[in-house]
Amino acid sequence: MAYAHLFTFSNFTFLRGASHPAEMVEQAYRLGYDAIALTDECSLAGAVKAHVMAEECGIKLIVGSYFKLSNNCELIALAPDRAAYAELSGFITLARRRADKGEYTAHMDDLRFRLQTCLIIWLPTANTATEDNARIFSAAFKQRLWLGVGHQLAGGEQRLFQQWQNLAATYQLPMVASHLALMHSAERKPLQDVLTAINHNTSVSQLGTRLQSNGENYLKAIDEVFYLYPPGLIKQTLLIAERCNFSLNELKYQYPQELVPKGLSPIAHLRALVDSGKARRWPGGVPAQAEAILAKELALIEELHYEYYFLTVYDIVAFARQQNILCQGRGSAANSVVCYCLFITEIAPGQINVLFERFISKERDEPPDIDVDFEHQRREDVIQYIYTKYSRQRAALAATVISYRSRSAIRDVGKALGLDPALVDHLAKSLAWWDRTGDLVKRIEAAGVQTERQLVQQFFALVQQIIGFPRHLSQHVGGFVITQDKVSDLVPVENASMPGRTVIQWDKEDLEAMGLLKVDILALGMLTALRKTLAMVNRYEPAIASLADIPPEDPHTYDMLCAADTVGVFQIESRAQMSMLPRLRPRTFYDLVIEIAIVRPGPIQGDMVHPYLRRRDGLEPVSYQSPDIADVLKPTLGVPIFQEQAIRLAMVAAGFSGGEADRLRRAMASWGKNGNLLQFEETFIQGMLNNGYELDFAHRLFEQIKGFGGYGFPESHSASFAILCYASSWLKCHHPAAFYCALLNSQPMGFYSPSQLIQDARRHGIPVLPVDVNHSEAESALEPANSYRTPWAIRLGFTRIKGLDSEAAQRIADNRAQQPYRDIQQLARRSGLSRADLQKLAAADALHSLAGNRHLAHWQAASVEAQAGLFDDEPPPGDALLTAPPSLEKDLTSDYNTTGLSLRVHPMGILRQEYPFSRCKQQRQLSGLSHGRFVQVAGLVTGRQRPGTAKGTLFLTLEDETGNINVVVWKSTQERYRKALLTSKLLIVKGHLERSTPTATTDATPVIHVVAGQLLDYSDRLESLALRSRDFH
């Protein structure tokens, strides 16, 4: 018996389909179907995932889509060939682009004029099975039209079937079996019910007729299909399948080609740009080694026809530089000297051991991947440039699939099952991001619920099933698809939630599977901060205008790093990096490259950190098994740290080709997911034995490579980041006021909150002054400091005030530059402020110079007439109602609630006078305590981290009035104090002090932390304070 299934919703028909596309295809293969059509509603979002599984199984996949038109007619459109696929994709694009995100609008006229070659299955209903509709469909699609019949074993189907037969006979329409499958197996019916309830924002018990009438909407065994449908209707499924011969493999990407001047070939234009760039990079002459690498790269680029790709990225980067937007390529592209000469990347060949095979490989036969970071506050300028240059028909962002995670699954499933909302909320909040779904049992038991109850068991099962289900499409962080022809010829395009952006329906993995080009236009906050720092510094030190003006290898900068004074510094400001810095003690740029890469899961899991540090301290000899291995590992003292080293070792020690070594890299990247790395073990070890290495060493080396897993950090990536790391370090060391000021103006970014940055700035002796209408600019700014320690103070800007209109803030600053404000009434009149603007300024104490205190400012702001015409230049009368100044505690609360920080006393400075905080040590006192001593500390919770390499250990950062306290919480302690650990704003921690012991060869600064034994939540003492921590960053 033969059968092709033609009507399938996967879970990419969001909140209707109850199975993944791959599950649908695999089940069709197991059931012996000849073909299966994936027909998600106005979507091809699941098509690639279905295609990959179909290729693996060897079953025919038909690409199609279901539509409900504006006249309520329903149909399926299937793509028989490449031209029809482009029509279908374009039709989906049209329907999606004319509606809001997540919706679509399609009309019958659209269908007639735009789907000229697709096969159409009309799905009549009781309301649409009319003579008029039959006449319209028949006239429009003629020999490409079928009348679809679904038999779901529901009431009234026999009467409808007779009606459909009459229409089919009248208009000579062949009838075809069109059984709607919402799930690959009947066992998913409860989940499908839950999805329906979520879709309708209600519970399953309240759905009524909106539920599927039974559980028949699944892929049935072929004998069941033959029982349900006449043979003639099943035969038509096969005839349709025979006509549908399109495969997604037919999609071919074409690069944009208008970037090449007339009369030049693409490679000639690229060579000319490279020649110009290398003359600027090496004004004294190009080194012979660089010339050789360039010749090799350009030859391979020409052979693989990647010229247009490089020209496209070059054009985008050139635009950014013309607009003074800081940008820098990173990742594997930093292995390319061509990218260096095009000023896409900044890593010179001599700075690292470039490995072009990591970037482009002939054997790999896939496009290269260039990631470029841009200033996060100006990246939108670059994005809109791309849209303008190529048009929205030829450029769109890649999608990201937003899927259910534990917390969202608990909330939605709980609501759908009608569970107590308070219980559902408690469970969702109590489940940390690292918890497995199985831990939900513990959380429910802790809430006093009997887990053996049937409803609770069903809840567990449904939460497990829905995790990983797609919820909706969002936009990728910056992956652009840019094409020579219309993007919609390849993949449908829809509106993003952000105005001015469009998104394709495929994600990064889909694009990789199809070999389609993606240019990553990424956002990096540190680039914004660096540009703003340089702009401020340049005003008083003209010699420093760009990153290129920063002196290299500055000893004072490295002294600062060795002391772990890195709050705000790019890439090395985390707890783990601060702990490593005094041990590694970087003194050169390459040391920074290693520092950034070594605090990663790969080197840690591969047991590479401690051997490297011992060798660096001279406590362990450095040895190499051969000169070839020495060439690879000498920069890292014989210990493999970088991903490129693993690739090189496979080539020089085990005899792998460049392509084989790259496949090894890919296996390393997916090792944690599927264990593919083990298939290389025998080849690797045998190759090493053939090259004369000992078996024990071969096994040991492979184990180290295996330890990299998916976490081995590329040297090229680390080196790109090290450039920004050094630049931010130098600026913090030599121009700290400008650096901190720029960080405040570049939020949100980085590891630390504005409050923490200000605390650190003040510890460095930099005065920080409050927002004030007679002194502040829109953004925070530098002003001369009356201090012998520093020439500059930071004046906080209006952007720190929550909810203040940015245009109003700019007007205040612009008008004040002409003449200071005398009173609040004049401020309102001259700057055109609303009463709401004034109230926000008063609440933030930004009217202090005009009113004296918050209470007076509130009263005076409230007394200002709203009509601008009634204002005059006279100040308010001197006998205005007197209002007592607020208390320090109230001022502190208002500060945090309006600006997220306070320049007054730290909250701990007030609490310190009370029990039990009076018994707690301050951060600055910890350095004088001995290792192992019992200690109590208290502070605001500013950060929680749980790195994957820490074996379940959680790290807390507490802030008191003297600094940051590092707290280590072992796994056993986490469970006992879980609620306090996850939700508290103010903690007292009781535990033991631990301090690292410097090695015999160094006087490095010891790292101090508290190992928690008890965690006591005192958040109620700060209930009115708007505090937020940066958790698991």
UniProtKB/Swiss-Prot annotation:
CC per GO annotation: cytoplasm
Compartments in which it is found: Cytoplasm
Keyword set, alphabetical order: Cytoplasm, DNA damage, DNA repair, DNA replication, DNA-directed DNA polymerase, Nucleotidyltransferase, Transferase
Origin: domain of life: Bacteria
First and last residue of the signal peptide: none
Alphabetized GO MF terms: 3'-5' exonuclease activity; DNA-directed DNA polymerase activity; nucleic acid binding
Gene3D superfamilies associated with the record: 1.10.150.870, Metal-dependent hydrolases, Nucleic acid-binding proteins
Catalysed reactions listed for this entry: DNA(n) + a 2'-deoxyribonucleoside 5'-triphosphate = DNA(n+1) + diphosphate
EC number: 2.7.7.7
Gene Ontology biological process terms, A to Z: DNA repair; DNA replication
Membership in a protein family: Belongs to the DNA polymerase type-C family. DnaE2 subfamily.
HAMAP family: DNApol_error_prone (MF_01902)
Role summary: DNA polymerase involved in damage-induced mutagenesis and translesion synthesis (TLS). It is not the major replicative DNA polymerase.
Protein name: Error-prone DNA polymerase
Organism of origin: Teredinibacter turnerae (strain ATCC 39867 / T7901)
Gene: dnaE2
